[in-house]
């Protein structure tokens, strides 16, 4: 009876998932490409816990994404191109969407600041100035380069981008312990809600990044046919403007469109 109940649950979820993808015109291949860009097996798209989260939370994630787009539209392409220049998958941008809504002045009670919610110690280790006079975590260009550097170092340590994202959230030490307990670095093992190798916040964090990236990739659903946004940014030119000291932490750039 228990086996039958489990089997029926799987069937219901699979049927619901199929209906969801059809209803929302989701392109499986685009979704799979996002997984691959983050070093995740394409089979993860069928993971039951992932599918349940996508079905139940997509509307909320979409609303959060649209709010960030509406408020920070011009910055999205700039940030994605910085990630691209640093050889970091542009899907990583959705980490910042989740952490701060792309708000430059975002601050947490724990002391994390800026678009990427960097802690002081991490920011300083990545070369940013953080003191009583200047906090370069508030500089969107410098902080994005610092976050890209940090994520690249985590990727070098653990070998996969999704592991770098997990470590970004819970810390590299916690991830090492989780991998040791799980005996594997496979995403399904690490995010298993029954085994709890990583905390609930971290499990939700990674799934939310993936799902938000997948929502954003459906351009027709979000922003029509604008080719500049999300996971396919065009090249643009960015030039800094020298300003007075009082505005050092301001996000002031001259942007030249690359449209042809």
Label the predicted regions.
Residues 88-105, 164-169:
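Short, functionally critical alpha-helical segments immediately adjacent to catalytic or ligand/cofactor-binding
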Residues 151-182:
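Catalytic and binding regions of secreted/periplasmic enzymes and modules that target cell-wall glycans
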Residues 6-15:
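Bacterial N-terminal signal peptides
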Residues 62-76, 85-88, 108-116, 136-144, ...:
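Solvent-exposed, acidic/flexible segments
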Residues 15-87, 256-259:
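An acidic, Gly/Ser/Thr/Pro-rich helix-cap/linker signature
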Residues 110-132, 140, 144-147, 151, ...:
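Substrate-binding/active-site groove segments that recognize
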Residues 1-5:
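Positively charged n-region of N-terminal signal peptides that target proteins for export
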Residues 221-260:
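Low-complexity, Gly/Ser/Thr/Pro-rich intrinsically disordered linker/tail segments
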């Amino acid at each position: 009876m228990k086996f039958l109940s489990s089997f029926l649950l799987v069937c219901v979820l699979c049927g619901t998932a199929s209906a969801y993808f059809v209803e929302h015109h989701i392109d499986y291949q685009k979704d799979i490409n996002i997984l691959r860009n983050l070093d995740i097996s394409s089979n993860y798209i069928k993971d039951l816990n992932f599918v349940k989260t996508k079905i139940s939370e997509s509307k909320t994630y979409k609303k959060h994404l649209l709010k960030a787009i509406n408020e920070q539209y011009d910055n999205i392409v700039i940030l994605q191109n910085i990630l691209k220049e640093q050889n970091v998958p542009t899907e990583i941008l959705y980490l910042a969407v989740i952490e701060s809504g792309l708000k430059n002045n975002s601050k947490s009670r724990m002391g994390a600041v800026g678009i990427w919610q960097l802690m002081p110690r991490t920011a300083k280790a990545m070369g940013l100035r953080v003191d009583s006079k200047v906090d370069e975590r508030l500089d969107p260009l410098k902080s994005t380069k610092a976050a890209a550097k940090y994520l690249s170092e985590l990727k070098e340590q653990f070998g996969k981008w999704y592991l770098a994202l997990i470590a970004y959230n819970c810390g590299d030490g916690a991830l090492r312990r989780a991998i040791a307990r799980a005996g594997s670095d496979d995403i399904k093992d690490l995010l298993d809600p029954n085994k709890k190798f990583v905390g609930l916040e971290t499990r939700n964090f990674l799934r939310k990044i993936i799902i938000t990236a997948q929502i954003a990739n459906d351009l027709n659903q979000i922003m029509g046919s604008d080719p500049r946004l999300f996971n396919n940014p065009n090249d643009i030119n960015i030039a800094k403007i020298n300003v007075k000291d009082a505005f050092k932490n301001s996000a002031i750039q001259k942007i030249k469109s690359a449209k042809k």
